[in-house]
UniProtKB/Swiss-Prot annotation:
Organism listed in the record: Buchnera aphidicola subsp. Acyrthosiphon pisum (strain APS)
Family to which the UniProt record says this protein belongs: Belongs to the HisA/HisF family.
EC number: 5.3.1.16
Gene Ontology terms describing biological process: L-histidine biosynthetic process; L-tryptophan biosynthetic process
SUPFAM superfamilies linked to this entry: Ribulose-phoshate binding barrel
Compartments in which it is found: Cytoplasm
Protein name: 1-(5-phosphoribosyl)-5-[(5-phosphoribosylamino)methylideneamino] imidazole-4-carboxamide isomerase
Residue positions of the active site: D7 (proton acceptor), D129 (proton donor)
Coarse class of the protein's main subcellular location: cytoplasm
Keyword set includes Isomerase: yes
InterPro entries noted in UniProt: Aldolase_TIM, His_biosynth, HisA_bact_arch, Isoase_HisA-like, Isoase_HisA-like_bact, RibuloseP-bd_barrel
Recorded metabolic or biological pathway in which this protein acts: Amino-acid biosynthesis; L-histidine biosynthesis; L-histidine from 5-phospho-alpha-D-ribose 1-diphosphate: step 4/9
Gene: hisA
Catalysed conversion reaction: 1-(5-phospho-beta-D-ribosyl)-5-[(5-phospho-beta-D-ribosylamino)methylideneamino]imidazole-4-carboxamide = 5-[(5-phospho-1-deoxy-D-ribulos-1-ylimino)methylamino]-1-(5-phospho-beta-D-ribosyl)imidazole-4-carboxamide
């Protein structure tokens, strides 16, 4: 499916280039209107990133998410600095459909396993931000991509499979926000290796052709942010393109 994305700072829709807060672009969009339009076009879920919360957990945009859930009908998944059980419970109790876990996957693996077991695999999305080197080693980066780890994508997924892991949002960080096109090889490989995982592809989608090629890799969803905001194509075109390849 197509998953539109909004990155949010103080309620405003922005895009960061390569995760850099000092390199942000503001978009003059009405978030609530956009969500209702997307719902009317057949969108089943929207991806929201709390960039304030990602930077400082004290600045989480909880009131905004409360308003979104109560005033709109499209389900949402929310990510950005979710690090504690309280963070997860607060969002799920508001009515958020799924929470997206990032850095804790590496820094607090056992806790993340407990979350998968407690909340259920349909409520949790693991966000794996990957740097692929010349030898095809897929190293996980955390903390807004600022810090590389020694953890490898495949090892992380294997670790959580026993807890029923179902949803993985995988981003090739060299492509995000660039409109340079996705890393098709990466998605084809991981979809082939982990057939029971619902992969969400993120980063670099610039054209309808990218959607066609991504669908063929086996991903279950495509997250699209900048291309929709900058009207490279319409949501109707994206949805039709995805459905045509089914």
């Amino acid at each position: 499916m197509i998953i539109p994305a909004f990155d949010l700072i103080n309620g405003r829709t922005v895009r960061l280039y390569q995760g850099d807060y000092s390199n942000q672009k503001n978009y003059n969009v009405n978030l609530f209107n956009s969500l209702e339009v997307y719902k009317s076009k057949g969108i089943e879920i929207v991806h929201l990133v709390d960039l304030d919360g990602a930077k400082n957990s004290a600045n989480r945009q909880i009131e905004l998410f409360k308003k979104i859930v109560s005033h709109t009908t499209v389900p949402v998944q929310v990510g950005g600095g979710i690090r504690t059980t309280k963070d997860i419970s607060t969002l799920l109790d508001l009515g958020v459909k799924r929470v997206v876990i990032g850095s804790s996957i590496v820094s607090n693996k056992k806790q993340v396993k407990q979350w998968l077991n407690f909340y259920g695999p349909d409520a949790i999305v693991l966000a794996l931000d990957v740097h692929v080197d010349g030898s095809n080693k897929k190293e996980i980066s955390i903390d807004g991509w600022q810090k590389k780890t020694n953890f490898i994508l495949e090892e992380i997924i294997e670790y959580f499979l026993s807890s029923g892991l179902k949803h993985v949002l995988c981003t090739d960080i060299s492509r995000d926000g660039t409109l340079l096109g996705p890393n098709f090889k990466l998605y084809k490989e991981i979809c082939s290796n982990f057939k029971n995982i619902n992969f969400q592809a993120s980063g670099g989608v610039a054209s309808l052709q990218d959607i066609i090629f991504l669908k063929k890799t086996g991903v279950k969803s495509i997250i699209i942010g900048r291309s929709l905001l900058e009207k490279k194509f319409t949501i109707e075109e994206a949805v039709k393109c995805w459905q045509r390849e089914s």
